[in-house]
UniProtKB/Swiss-Prot annotation:
Catalytic activity: N(6)-[(R)-lipoyl]-L-lysyl-[glycine-cleavage complex H protein] + glycine + H(+) = N(6)-[(R)-S(8)-aminomethyldihydrolipoyl]-L-lysyl-[glycine-cleavage complex H protein] + CO2
InterPro entries found in the cross-reference section: GcvPA, GDC-P_N, GDC_P, PyrdxlP-dep_Trfase, PyrdxlP-dep_Trfase_major, PyrdxlP-dep_Trfase_small
Keyword Oxidoreductase: yes
Native species: Chlorobaculum parvum (strain DSM 263 / NCIMB 8327) (Chlorobium vibrioforme subsp. thiosulfatophilum)
Subunit structure: The glycine cleavage system is composed of four proteins: P, T, L and H. In this organism, the P 'protein' is a heterodimer of two subunits.
EC number assigned by the record: 1.4.4.2
Stated role: The glycine cleavage system catalyzes the degradation of glycine. The P protein binds the alpha-amino group of glycine through its pyridoxal phosphate cofactor; CO(2) is released and the remaining methylamine moiety is then transferred to the lipoamide cofactor of the H protein.
Designated name of the protein: Probable glycine dehydrogenase (decarboxylating) subunit 1
PANTHER family in UniProt: GLYCINE CLEAVAGE SYSTEM P-PROTEIN (PTHR42806), GLYCINE DEHYDROGENASE (DECARBOXYLATING) (PTHR42806:SF1)
Gene that encodes the chain: gcvPA
Gene Ontology molecular functions: glycine dehydrogenase (decarboxylating) activity
Length: 444
């Protein structure tokens, strides 16, 4: 496709219109020392076929899950996404849609968001879900802000092992909110110590936060943690993986006041880290404190169902300092993909995905621990992810496995810890699992 540049006459007309004589006058405010003094080192002009070939060659340097067996996890998982998800989400009515300021003219977009909210409420056992957040980390941080607002208290206690990146986002949000203290509970055998937590939660605690499954893949003692939070009048916030809820209890059923999650694992590809989807759900008591958009269903003057943005006095339509948030855009397309995927799966389908992921993860863990020098780092129960102690550095295993077109897992040394974090989804076959074990045996 040719690019038609501006002519000299057109450039002169534009400069004259904005009131400068020449291009040098236009950039006069840019200091000389920061201006580029030489021509850019660009390739010569190419046609579309040549550009396409060049980009494909550059892209081939990447390793991707389409041609590698992946055991990567730590928040981004290689679950199967039916072709129908992308086909439906790519329809022009959805793909190019943006909720306008007169939102009610976009009934299709609003209904899709309403259905997403309804599905998330059922999945998490909660009363209200918003239209989505940027990602799981921002959803958790916003949940903490809700707790500070609702309780009027100052501190946050993290009960178990939170994802390190999520911890960083939480710290950033709370620092901006007045440098609120965050207390980390001690970790014993991969999960938070309930006994130690008892000594950390007080009448000054706004919320107790737990991730389930946690960063190591282990299952926290969520019911005991929730009881401690309630005893001290703190809100109980759970960050739960949506796929895990196919087999684990919904957070609302064991007392969560706010439940959040990273929605990448339902309907959204790993995509080199984003865009992802932040799930945020609350009990009815906190509906006016929830950030972001809420879609509600009502009747029009003729008695037909209609969808609206509701309770907008919480949001950016009022004075900034009184709003619960100033988020206007959300991850609506990612949310659409999530609700399409979950709708295609249904209740039995999500249970099947969760069960197969869990069973295959435990099969692989059992096989790996039979190898000399390999062992599970923690004895706590896990869902689809676990940490292995290895006889050689995890980085070495990861590097060697790449030659076999295998992503072996996540090296925990990035966070100053030992071990290889391995995740297994329903996509992995028995042959792939057994082959992985054989390759590990040759490295041990």
């Amino acid at each position: 496709m040719p690019f038609i540049v501006n002519t000299d006459a057109e450039r002169a007309e534009m400069l004259r219109e904005i009131g400068v004589e020449n291009f040098e006058a236009l950039i006069a405010d840019i200091p000389e020392e920061v201006r580029l003094k030489k021509a850019l080192d660009l390739l010569p002009a190419m046609g579309e076929p040549e550009v396409k070939s060049l980009l494909e060659k550059m892209a081939s340097s990447n390793a991707a899950t389409c041609d590698h067996v992946s055991f990567l996890g730590a928040g981004a998982y290689d679950h199967f996404i039916p072709a129908a998800v992308k086909t439906i989400a790519s329809r022009s009515e959805f793909y190019t849609a943006y909720t306008p300021y007169q939102a009610e003219v976009s009934q299709g977009t609003l209904q899709a968001i309403y259905e997403y909210q309804s599905v998330m409420c059922r999945l998490y056992g909660m009363d209200v879900a918003n239209a989505s957040m940027y990602d799981g980390a921002s959803a958790l941080a916003e949940a903490a802000l809700i707790a500070l607002n609702v309780t009027g208290r100052n501190g946050i206690v993290v009960a178990g092992k939170l994802h390190p990146y999520t911890s960083q986002v939480l710290e950033t949000y709370l620092e901006a909110a007045g440098d609120r203290p965050i207390v980390q509970n001690s970790i014993e055998d991969g999960i938070g110590s309930v006994a130690a937590l008892e000594t950390l939660v007080s009448s000054e605690t706004a919320a107790v936060i737990v991730q389930q499954p946690n960063f190591y893949g282990c299952l926290e003692e969520v019911e005991a943690i929730g009881e401690i939070a309630k005893k001290h009048g703190a809100l109980f916030i759970v960050s739960a993986d949506p796929v895990s809820l196919g087999v684990l209890e919904a957070p609302g059923n064991y007392g969560a006041d706010i439940a959040v999650g990273e929605g990448q694992s339902v309907g959204n590809a790993q995509s080199f880290g984003g865009p992802y989807l932040g799930i945020l759900t609350v009990k009815q008591a906190h509906v006016r404190k929830i950030p972001g958009r809420l879609v509600g269903m009502t009747k029009d003057k003729d008695g037909n169902d209609g969808f609206i943005l509701t309770l907008q006095t919480r949001e950016q339509h009022i004075r900034r300092e009184k709003a619960t948030s100033n988020i206007c855009s959300n991850q609506a397309l990612c949310a659409l993909q999530a609700v399409v995927h979950l709708s295609l799966l249904g209740k039995e389908g999500i249970q099947d995905v969760a069960n197969r992921s869990m069973q295959k993860a435990h099969y692989l863990a059992d096989r790996i621990t039979e190898l000399p020098g390999f062992s599970l780092k923690f004895s706590a129960p896990f869902f689809r992810e676990f940490v292995v102690e290895t006889p050689v550095p995890a980085a070495t295993i990861i590097e060697k496995m790449l030659d076999k077109k295998v992503f072996a897992g996540v090296d925990l040394s990035a966070w100053g810890e030992d071990g290889l974090l391995i995740a297994v989804t329903e996509k992995r076959t028995k042959e792939e699992l057994d082959s992985f074990v054989s390759e590990l045996a040759s490295l041990g």
